[in-house]
UniProtKB/Swiss-Prot annotation:
InterPro entries: Cyclotide, Cyclotide_bracelet_CS, Cyclotide_sf. It comes from the Eukaryota. PROSITE patterns: CYCLOTIDE, CYCLOTIDE_BRACELET. The presence of a 'disulfide through disulfide knot' structurally defines this protein as a knottin. This is Cycloviolacin-O20. The keyword Disulfide bond applies. The keyword Disulfide bond applies. It comes from Viola odorata (Sweet violet). Keywords: Disulfide bond, Knottin, Plant defense. Probably participates in a plant defense mechanism. This is a cyclic peptide.
Length: 30
């Protein structure tokens, strides 16, 4: 539920390396 400061409209979350995932076109962590 914490925004990672990255969008995932066109590309996947690069922040997935630190546990972020794409939700509603924005990368979130928990």
């Amino acid at each position: 539920g914490i925004p990672c400061g990255e969008s995932c409209v066109w590309i996947p979350c690069l922040t997935s390396a630190i546990g972020c995932s794409c939700k509603s076109k924005v990368c979130y962590r928990d």
